[in-house]
C-alpha cells in the first residue's frame, strides 16, 4: 500500500518504523520544520525526520499546509492512504480527501474522551483509570472523525505522563497495524463518536503548573504525575518556586492545606481533604531535580512551613 506518513515527535516513531518493517511503500513523510534546541539554539530535526532519512524516504516540512503549493504536492503523491500520528498541524480538507482511503489518525485516548492536543497528560490529570489509542478516519473537525479500532490500557496509580506516553506510543503501532490490515481486508466498521460524551484535552501551558493545596491529595498527586516532565507541577515556599516531579499518596493527616507535616527522611504535605502527599523528587530554581533527601540537605524545609 502506498502511504504518506505525517508525524513529528518521538511518539510517532514506532508507527513509522512499523510501516517500514511491514513493507509498505512509504512514499513520503510530512513533519514539522527543524527547530532550534538547547542553550546554543542548534537547529534540530524532528525524530520522525531522522528515521525517514535513515531509510531514504523523501521528507517534506512545510511551514503551512494552507498554500496551493502544499496541497498540490500532497495530491501529486497519489497515495492510497495517509497515516497521521501527532503531526502537530490541522489538515485542510484537500489533504483529508486526497488519498484513496483518506487519512487515518492514531489518537492517544479512548475517543470521544480527551479530544485535543494533550490527551496523555489530561488522562492522568483528570483521574482516568484507563486510556488507550483509537484509530480514526479523519474529517475536518478536531478529533471528531469516525472511530475504527481502539485498544485500552490501565493507568498505574503512580504512573507519570512520560511513562504512559511510552506505553501508548508502542500501543499506537499495534492499533495502526491492525487498522491497516482490516482496511485491506475490507473489514473496517467505522463508528460515529457520541459528541455528548466528548471531553477536551487542551495544550499544556506553564500556567497549569501551580498546585492548589486546598485540592484533594488524589487530585494533587494526579496533577504532579500528569504534568511530568513538562511543564511540571510546582509549589512556592519561602518565596521560591519549587518544581515537584514525583509524589505518592501518604494517607490521612491533621495538617492544614500546604503545611509540611513531616520533613527529614520524608517530605509530606497536607492537602485540602485531610489527606497528604509525599514528595519524592523536587527541584529548586536553577538546579537539577533530585531525590528529597538530597534536596533537603542543601535546601532545608522546616516541619510546619507552608507551600503557598
Give the predicted meaning of each segment.
Residues 7, 29, 52, 82, ...:
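A residue-level signal for conserved active-site and pocket-lining positions in enzyme catalytic cores
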Residues 202-215:
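Acyl-group handling in specialized metabolite and lipid biosynthesis
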Residues 214-308:
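An anion-binding loop in the catalytic cleft
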Amino acid at each position: 500500500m502506498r502511504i504518506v506518513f505525517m508525524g513529528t515527535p518521538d511518539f510517532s516513531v514506532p508507527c513509522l518504523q512499523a510501516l517500514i518493517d511491514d513493507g509498505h511503500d512509504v512514499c513520503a513523510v510530512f513533519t514539522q520544520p527543524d527547530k532550534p534546541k538547547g542553550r546554543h539554539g542548534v537547529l534540530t530535526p524532528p525524530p520522525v525526520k531522522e528515521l525517514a532519512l535513515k531509510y531514504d524516504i523523501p521528507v517534506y516540512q512545510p511551514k503551512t499546509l494552507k498554500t496551493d503549493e502544499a496541497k498540490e504536492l500532497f495530491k501529486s503523491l497519489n497515495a492510497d492512504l495517509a497515516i497521521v500520528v501527532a503531526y502537530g498541524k490541522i489538515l485542510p480538507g484537500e489533504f483529508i480527501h486526497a488519498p484513496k482511503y483518506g487519512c487515518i489518525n492514531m489518537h492517544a485516548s479512548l475517543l470521544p474522551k480527551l479530544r485535543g492536543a494533550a490527551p496523555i497528560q489530561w488522562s492522568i490529570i483528570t483521574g482516568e483509570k484507563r486510556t488507550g489509542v483509537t484509530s480514526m478516519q479523519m474529517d475536518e473537525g478536531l478529533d471528531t472523525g469516525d472511530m475504527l479500532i481502539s485498544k485500552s490500557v490501565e493507568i498505574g496509580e503512580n504512573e507519570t505522563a512520560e511513562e504512559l506516553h511510552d506505553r501508548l506510543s508502542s500501543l499506537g503501532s499495534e492499533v495502526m497495524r491492525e487498522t491497516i490490515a482490516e482496511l485491506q481486508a475490507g473489514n473496517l466498521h467505522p463508528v460515529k463518536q457520541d459528541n455528548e460524551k466528548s471531553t477536551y484535552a487542551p495544550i499544556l501551558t506553564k500556567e497549569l503548573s501551580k498546585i492548589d493545596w486546598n485540592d484533594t491529595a488524589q487530585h494533587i498527586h494526579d496533577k504532579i504525575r500528569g504534568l511530568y516532565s513538562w511543564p511540571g507541577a510546582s509549589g512556592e515556599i519561602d518565596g521560591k518556586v519549587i518544581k515537584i516531579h514525583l509524589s505518592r499518596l501518604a494517607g490521612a493527616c491533621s495538617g492544614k492545606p500546604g503545611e509540611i507535616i513531616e520533613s527529614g527522611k520524608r517530605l509530606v504535605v497536607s492537602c485540602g481533604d485531610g489527606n497528604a502527599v509525599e514528595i519524592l523528587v523536587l527541584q529548586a530554581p536553577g538546579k537539577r531535580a533530585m531525590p528529597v533527601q538530597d534536596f533537603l540537605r542543601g535546601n532545608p524545609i522546616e516541619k510546619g512551613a507552608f507551600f503557598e
